[in-house]
Amino acid sequence: MIDKSAVIHPSSIIEEGAVIGANVRIGPFCVIGSHVEIGEGTDIKSHVVINGHTRIGRDNQIYQFASIGEVNQDLKYRGEPTQVIIGDRNLIRESVTIHRGTTQGGNITKIGNDNLLMINTHVAHDCIIGDRCIIANNGTLGGHVTLGDYVIIGGMSAVHQFCQIGSHVMVGGCSGVAQDVPPFVIAQGNHATPYGLNIEGLKRRGFAKEDLHAIRNAYKILYRNGKTLEEAREEIAQLAADNNNQYVKIFSDFLENSAKSNRGIIR
């Protein structure tokens, strides 16, 4: 179904069954598959291929040569009808690739709202990206990677499969992230290690002084007091319970969740 207000260049191919919302613009030489849904106001430039079971929200901008919903690169994939789900107001720049999920990873690759994926970003199968994240040019997320909200991944950086990146993390350019990165932390290098807290980013987002102080205390327990990871995890959990700070609770919950994975935490 194509809304009558949509503007589609005659050279583009829209397969039967695709759903094209109101005021969508599709430029020249695009291919939109039969199981694709594109939300109202989304602007697709030119030479874009969107296929598979892909649902895209409203007011997104998708630039030339992007490929969304393509068969993933997991050798176990056997053509199951897995999905890509993209939210609203995302900016997806030239040559970005976003692959569909796998049955082993929950069937979905999911991107939230208001994200910027710069040129040549790769989002592999089963990745989950929150809101207001930025992945700079040539950034790569391996399969099953999770990004919280407000994450920044520097240019030419790669995140190993199954890693979790907490909210408000900044990963420096040309880094290789092979372990989980707790919220609010700056990570840099190959392999990436902690370089303090993303204080400037938190200030720009309006974090109060008392919240920054509480986050610093949690960071010091994890990284500067010579404790084992298990000791630090327990002490931060107690700190979260004692001071009732929402951000320390986020920090503590991340550490608890990370304990269930096999990647470990950057140290």
Curated annotation (Swiss-Prot):
Cited Gene3D superfamilies = Hexapeptide repeat proteins (2.160.10.10), Udp N-acetylglucosamine O-acyltransferase, C-terminal domain (1.20.1180.10)
Q: In which pathway does it act?
A: Glycolipid biosynthesis; lipid IV(A) biosynthesis; lipid IV(A) from (3R)-3-hydroxytetradecanoyl-[acyl-carrier-protein] and UDP-N-acetyl-alpha-D-glucosamine: step 1/6
**A GO-annotated cellular component:** membrane
What Enzyme Commission number(s) does the record list for this chain? 2.3.1.129
Catalytic activity line of the entry:
a (3R)-hydroxyacyl-[ACP] + UDP-N-acetyl-alpha-D-glucosamine = a UDP-3-O-[(3R)-3-hydroxyacyl]-N-acetyl-alpha-D-glucosamine + holo-[ACP]
Which keywords belong to this entry?
Answer: Acyltransferase, Cytoplasm, Lipid A biosynthesis, Lipid biosynthesis, Lipid metabolism, Repeat, Transferase
GO biological process terms held by the UniProt record: lipid A biosynthetic process
Q: Which terms does the record give in the GO molecular function aspect?
A: acyl-[acyl-carrier-protein]-UDP-N-acetylglucosamine O-acyltransferase activity
Instruction: Enumerate the subcellular locations listed in this protein's record, separating them with semicolons.
Output: Cytoplasm
Database matches in Pfam families: Acetyltransf_11, Hexapep
Presence of the UniProt keyword S-adenosyl-L-methionine in the record: no
> What role is this protein assigned?
Involved in the biosynthesis of lipid A, a phosphorylated glycolipid that anchors the lipopolysaccharide to the outer membrane of the cell.
**What interactions and quaternary structure are annotated?**
Homotrimer.
Put simply, this protein is called: Acyl-[acyl-carrier-protein]--UDP-N-acetylglucosamine O-acyltransferase
Q: Which organism is it from?
A: Proteus mirabilis (strain HI4320)
